[in-house]
């Protein structure tokens, strides 16, 4: 038996994080019965001579939460998990917490577009026992001591709503301090003052000057303490980074004149300063290029995989100018960037000496290809691509006999990695890169399968919660929300639309399903209640009809069923989609309140029931689907048609019995009886047949469609849908050479041409939501029901002769659970590994239920 992956709030040995609650989690490897209890203890002493808190798991999940009110500032804590004669120990350390800041915000007089350096020299005559640096900048920053960069993270402090919170970082600098020490910062524009937002963007969104605040706390071996603060004595200078922008890239000129600026103490509040929630952005992988010349005779680096990150190289000769431009694709054999819109995505180096190691600092790129000027081919082959993402464990592995399916799963994972950088972005390359909520609503379940997302999503939910507080509970289309005056853009002037807004319920719900973290759920439960309450208040103001047939809706975004080429609007009735999500969000909220034994759950349970009943009353006549309901002439539909006219000059057809409409009704049980269900299934079969088994769904329907097909008995239709290779399909993208998932089903046409440039990313994760179907239905790993006291994992694979074998391994809340199956004549050989302290049962093809023991379980099944 082995204990591993000890984490506090989803982070291993967190230093200086915000601890509004404490959740201790771990994994077990080995055969241990679920009835064995695990004990967790917390102490200030490494010997655990005094126990500050202890608790025992009351479930079969390896996780336990408690309040954090016993924590003290700037204190290292030891914690251990133990049972029988086995234990494992880890640590966590608090930040300044609520201690007042003695440091001052510092900046400079005048104006500059350049990057800025802040520095201060210190002398230490005594031996240092322990030292911590607490700091943050307005703008992205890197910090060095004696010219050595601190830590492995980049793009600090990440992206958050600067007007609502400002997260500071804590560094252990004990080993860095010598007798004469210089602490230096380089601060760029970043999201704080650099160009950001679509349609050309805005500058100086949060401020027009970089700023810094820093405190160095030193404890010496003689027991004395000293603290050093940012103030007017710090030196402020320009540096070699002449230009930097999230969208446009970075320019470094080593001949640029370094100017000393006048240091200025700025009267800025420290009330928004809070310990970090954001995970560090780190290099997770390095890739090496194939060098070739395109049809325009331009030198191109092909890294074979689309990534988010930058390049790194060491110059072999003096260079007057080297230019790198980053793009996603080739067109007609040539480098192509038109789909980036206004984003330049360039890295330029000027007047560099031989031996200089170069990389960007305050930007990142979405790319597979790099156009290079100023290097020889021998020099270009030494360029390394470094993939950046927020630091998270990957938690799912997949393999099968179908290489195309394997590539699809890889593409989904890469799109998640590429877009999980500080916040969950829509895309990493064009002039957008924003935290769109709708993408995450449909993808959050898959995201939690692929990675340990608790801390990452906690940071995003904090931003979402703060933005929601400004909107009376409505959820914005993206978070953070840049506060700019742009009445032309409807996404900035509106909030509270179905699917997008439902990120407020889907993210907390899916986090709890996967990780059973009650502390995290308590912290962000208000996201759920505030969002549903907001919908409820709008509903009540219109008479309490329990239909969401009002307001501004996007419907089934990017669906193909309108028949209008290039349109972003699908044909499914927006009121049907919105009302279904009204029901789902109320239901999820009720369930999470029940988990926390909160008696408010009954209100939301009743609300969900009322919404469901109204949906059935509106969209069914007896057991027949009503294809001409009153909602087709509703406020929401009129607004949607107006949007279609304003943003495309088209009229959108509207229907109920689309693939999306039918899939949503079926998957979420929104029908009056089994006869009605059977008729929905028949109609869905007809809709699939109309399109030769291909999908026509958009954001709202794609995740539900394969589940609805299989759960309705259309098993082969569901699996055939997954494995189709022509457009529109998931594997068509693979056939076209994709290494990430696309924003549109037709981002690239069968002839290899890009379908358009206005809104066409090759690195969007939303349609990767199909992965949860692969895990839950094809492999057959189904998480315990959130309200099921038996806490039982259900293993129920769906075999198909189109695949010889399939294997999936999931790092659950308890440890690795793997399922593999292989066809063997008329039999299927099934191999299942269950982690310790885990209850699981297998459901065979003929319906037999078999409880599984921790460890290996082998059995035979049959295929139908």
Features from the language model and the residues they span:
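Extracellular/oxidizing-compartment recognition motifs
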Residues: 1-76, 80-430, 438, 455-458, ...
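Alpha-helix capping and helix-loop boundary segments enriched in small/acidic/polar residues
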Residues: 110-113, 132, 158-162, 172-174, ...
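Alpha-helical support elements that line or immediately flank enzyme active sites
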Residues: 134, 310-316, 321-326, 362, ...
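Active-site acid/base region of carbohydrate-active enzymes
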Residues: 140, 233-238, 380-411, 424-442, ...
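Helix-terminus loop motifs that line ligand-binding clefts
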Residues: 152-157, 161-163, 332-342, 454-564, ...
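C-terminal capping/lid segments that line or modulate ligand- or cofactor-binding pockets
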Residues: 183, 252-253, 431-432, 447-450, ...
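Non-catalytic C-terminal accessory modules of carbohydrate-active enzymes
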Residues: 202-206, 213-215, 224-256, 265-267, ...
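Heptad-repeat amphipathic alpha-helical coiled-coil interaction surface used
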Residues: 512, 583, 589-590, 608
């Amino acid at each position: 038996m082995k204990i591993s992956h000890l984490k506090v709030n989803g982070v291993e040995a967190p230093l200086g994080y915000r601890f509004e609650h404490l959740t201790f989690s771990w994994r077990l490897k080995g055969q241990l019965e679920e009835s064995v209890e695990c004990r967790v203890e917390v102490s200030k002493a490494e010997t655990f001579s005094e126990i500050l808190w202890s608790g025992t798991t009351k479930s079969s999940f390896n996780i336990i939460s408690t309040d954090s009110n016993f924590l003290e500032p700037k204190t290292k804590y030891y914690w251990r998990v133990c049972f029988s004669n086995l234990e494992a120990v880890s640590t966590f350390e608090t930040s300044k917490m609520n201690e007042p800041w003695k440091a001052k915000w510092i900046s400079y007089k005048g104006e500059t577009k350049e990057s800025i350096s802040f520095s201060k020299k210190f002398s230490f005559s005594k031996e240092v026992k322990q030292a911590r640096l607490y700091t943050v900048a307005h703008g992205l920053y890197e910090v060095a001591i004696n010219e050595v960069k601190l830590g492995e993270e980049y793009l600090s402090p990440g992206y958050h709503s600067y007007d609502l919170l400002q997260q500071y970082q804590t560094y252990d600098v004990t080993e860095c301090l010598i007798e004469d020490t210089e602490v230096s910062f380089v601060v760029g524009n970043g999201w704080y003052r650099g160009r950001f937002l679509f349609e050309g963007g805005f500058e100086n969104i949060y401020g027009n000057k970089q700023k810094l605040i820093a405190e160095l706390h030193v404890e010496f071996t003689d027991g004395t303490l000293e603290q050093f603060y940012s103030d007017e004595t710090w030196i402020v200078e320009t540096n070699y980074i002449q230009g930097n922008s999230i969208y446009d890239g970075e320019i470094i000129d080593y001949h640029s004149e370094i100017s000393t600026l006048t240091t200025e103490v700025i009267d800025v509040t420290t009330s928004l300063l809070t310990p970090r929630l954001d995970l560090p952005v780190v290099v997770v992988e390095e890739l090496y290029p194939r060098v070739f010349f395109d049809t325009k005779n331009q030198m191109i680096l092909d890294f074979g995989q689309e990534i988010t990150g930058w390049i790194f190289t060491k110059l072999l000769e003096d260079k007057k100018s080297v230019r790198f431009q980053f793009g996603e694709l080739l067109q007609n054999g040539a480098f192509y960037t038109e789909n980036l819109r206004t984003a330049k995505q360039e890295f330029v180096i000027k007047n560099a000496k031989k031996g200089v190691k170069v990389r960007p600092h305050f930007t990142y790129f979405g790319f597979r290809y790099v156009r290079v000027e100023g290097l020889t081919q021998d020099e270009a082959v030494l360029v390394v691509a470094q993939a950046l993402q927020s630091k998270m464990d990957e938690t799912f592995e997949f393999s099968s006999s179908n290489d195309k399916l394997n590539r699809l799963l890889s593409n989904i994972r890469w799109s998640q990695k590429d877009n999980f950088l500080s916040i969950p972005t829509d895309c990493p390359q064009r002039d957008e890169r924003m935290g769109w909520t709708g993408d995450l609503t449909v993808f959050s379940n898959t995201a939690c399968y692929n990675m340990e997302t608790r801390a990452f999503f906690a940071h995003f939910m904090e931003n979402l919660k703060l933005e929601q507080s400004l909107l009376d509970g409505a959820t914005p289309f993206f978070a953070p929300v840049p506060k700019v005056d742009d009445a032309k853009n409807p996404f900035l002037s509106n909030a509270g639309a179905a699917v997008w807004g439902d990120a407020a319920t889907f993210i907390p719900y899916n986090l709890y399903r996967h990780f059973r973290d009650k502390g995290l759920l308590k912290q962000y439960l208000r996201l759920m209640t505030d969002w549903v309450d907001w919908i409820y208040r709008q509903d009540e103001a219109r008479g309490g009809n329990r239909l969401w047939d009002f307001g501004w809706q996007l419907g089934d975004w990017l669906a193909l069923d309108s028949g209008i080429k290039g349109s972003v609007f699908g044909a499914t009735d927006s009121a049907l989609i919105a009302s279904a999500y009204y029901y789902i969000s109320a239901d999820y909220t009720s369930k999470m309140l029940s988990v926390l034994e909160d008696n408010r759950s009954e209100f939301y349970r009743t609300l969900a029931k009322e919404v469901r009943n109204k949906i059935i009353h509106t969209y069914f006549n007896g057991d027949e689907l009503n294809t001409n309901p009153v909602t087709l002439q509703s406020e929401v539909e009129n607004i949607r048609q107006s949007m279609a006219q304003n943003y495309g000059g088209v009229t959108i057809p509207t229907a109920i019995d689309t693939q999306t409409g039918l899939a949503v009704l079926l998957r979420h049980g929104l029908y009056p009886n089994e006869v009605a269900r059977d008729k929905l299934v028949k109609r869905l079969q007809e809709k699939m047949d109309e399109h030769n088994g291909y999908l026509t769904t958009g954001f709202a329907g794609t995740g539900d469609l394969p589940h609805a097909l299989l759960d309705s008995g259309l098993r082969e239709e569901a699996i055939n849908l997954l494995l189709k290779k022509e457009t529109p399909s998931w594997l068509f993208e693979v056939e076209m050479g994709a290494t990430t998932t696309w924003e549109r089903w037709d981002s690239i046409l069968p002839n290899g041409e890009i379908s358009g440039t206005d809104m066409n990313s090759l690195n969007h994760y939303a349609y990767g939501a199909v992965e949860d179907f692969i895990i839950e239905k094809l492999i057959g790993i189904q998480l315990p029901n959130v309200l099921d006291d038996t806490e039982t994992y259900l293993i129920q694979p769906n075999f198909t002769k189109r695949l010889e074998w399939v294997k999936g391994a999931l790092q659950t809340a308890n440890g690795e659970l793997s399922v593999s199956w292989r066809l063997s004549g008329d039999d299927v050989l099934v191999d299942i590994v269950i982690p310790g302290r885990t209850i699981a049962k297998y459901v065979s093809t003929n319906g037999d239920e078999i409880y599984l023991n921790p460890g290996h379980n082998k059995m035979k099944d049959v295929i139908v």
